């Protein structure tokens, strides 16, 4: 399963670890992903999404129906 938020589209970023001597070694910055089940009243079922903590805040703000409409408009199957 890919490490991509279904709401925000955030994916791993790359950068460097820096030691005290400022030596650079490559690393990945992973998104804060969680699998969460949401009850969708209009569909009378649960929907499971893999999303970041920011994605959860967006759902709190806009509502699950609006966010699902955006995801489906992008062509993702839910």
Swiss-Prot record:
SUPFAM superfamilies: L28p-like. Disulfide bonds: none annotated. Pfam families: Ribosomal_L28. Gene3D superfamilies: Ribosomal protein L28/L24. The keyword Iron does not apply. GO terms for cellular component: cytosolic large ribosomal subunit. GO terms for molecular function: structural constituent of ribosome. GO terms for biological process: translation. Keywords: Ribonucleoprotein, Ribosomal protein. Transmembrane segments: none annotated. Belongs to the bacterial ribosomal protein bL28 family. PANTHER family: 39S RIBOSOMAL PROTEIN L28, MITOCHONDRIAL, LARGE RIBOSOMAL SUBUNIT PROTEIN BL28M. NCBIfam families: L28 (TIGR00009). This is Large ribosomal subunit protein bL28. It comes from Haemophilus influenzae (strain ATCC 51907 / DSM 11121 / KW20 / Rd).
């Amino acid at each position: 399963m890919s490490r991509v938020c279904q709401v925000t589209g955030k994916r791993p970023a790359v950068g460097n670890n820096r030691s005290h001597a400022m030596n650079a070694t490559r690393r990945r910055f992973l998104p804060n992903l969680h699998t969460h089940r949401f009850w969708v009243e209009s569909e009378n079922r649960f929907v499971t999404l893999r999303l970041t903590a920011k994605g959860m805040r967006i759902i709190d703000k806009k509502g699950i129906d609006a966010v699902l409409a955006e995801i489906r408009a992008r062509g993702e199957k839910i």
